[in-house]
Amino acid sequence: MAKKSAIEKNNRRKKMTKNAAPKRARLKAIIADKSKPMEERFAATLKLAEMPRNSSATRIRNRCDLTGRPRSVYRLNKLSRIAIRDLGSRGLVPGLVKSSW
């Protein structure tokens, strides 16, 4: 089980990213638009740099919904390999059977 503080920190980052996404997209569009004057694009770059780092989507870590484990998390169901194995061995994942040959 991951530390509760790490899980909460990641949840705060998710919330902050969601709130700041429109503003970030607007600023990035201004920066990428070559028809705008250089001063305006530079000002947009400075505004983007002033935004909190945690509002960037790259700071979000994929974590297991059950355990909070940060590594080996499948995006499809947001569970770690260990959680999938545990649920599968208890028969809680439909269609998942233990392999034998």
UniProtKB/Swiss-Prot annotation:
GO biological process, one term: translation
Domain of life: Bacteria
Record-level Gene Ontology MF annotations: rRNA binding; structural constituent of ribosome
HAMAP family in the cross-refs: Ribosomal_uS14_1
Keywords, in A-Z order: Ribonucleoprotein, Ribosomal protein, RNA-binding, rRNA-binding
Species: Rhodopseudomonas palustris (strain TIE-1)
Disulfide-bond pairs as recorded: none
Protein name: Small ribosomal subunit protein uS14
GO cellular component: cytoplasm; small ribosomal subunit
